[in-house]
Amino acid sequence: MGSPPGRGPLVDGERVLLIDAKERRYLLTLVAGAAFHTHAGILAHDDLIGREEGSTVSGSTGRSFLVLRPTLADVVLKMPRGAQVIYPKDLGAILMAADIGPGQRVLEAGVGSGALSMAVLRAGASVVGYEVREDFANRARSNVAGLLGPDVDYRVERRDVTEGIDEVGLDRVLLDLPEPWRVLGPAAGALRPGGILLAYLPTINQTAELRGALAEGPWGLADSVEILRRTWHVEARSVRPDHRMVGHTGFLTTARRLSAAPASGTGPEAPVSPAR
């Protein structure tokens, strides 16, 4: 009986991450008989195939590389891309904010290079993507298949989500679009009551526009956040924040789809009568 995927010795055809002495990272797919060419020399793929991950290997010049299987964050940062990707610090927050889990049906509009699709699929959901650009759609399909294989429950259609959503009874709708407020009508019709809408936007002006539109429709519990990531230098007695940090990348806005006919005065956004 073989090892589960992602365990055991490295095999022909899987992705690996090489890290050199300066912690530069290289993502490659192992191919028997091939070689990896770098400033540090040539490293034969055959010298990696069959090794345990966590091993140290040397190239033709004697310089060493640590070899590991890549994490999802490694793949997102190193994979081929056309559109700007959603960064790992935001991907984790999106999975929590949208409460993504196994068995859910998710619509993603604006798939870009497929980073968010990968994260949602890995969490066990199925994904239908709407993408207006064929080159982005093809890149997303390729990147997802490269990480998760061809059998994941993933379909990308070339279409404009503002023209309508065919799916109904969706659990989640994820939007990476410049004008997500134009999709609120179709999204409300596609989401089940209690479902979650999440939009990723680069500017606060766009976020404010979206929040205003949400306040006028069947949405409740709207919330907007920004995720900042700061690493620390920790070495012996030298402990301080790193000089550089991953600051603003985008704003995450979530809202719950309310029932079409909520009881008067019982919803979370229900107006409060002034005291007399």
Residue ranges and their predicted role:
Residues 2-3, 181-251:
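C-terminal substrate-binding/active-site "lid" region of AdoMet-derived donor-dependent transferases
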Residues 7-8, 77-92:
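Conserved SAM-binding loop and adjacent beta-strand
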Residues 101-112:
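Conserved class I S-adenosyl-L-methionine
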Residues 122-128, 193:
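Conserved S-adenosyl-L-methionine
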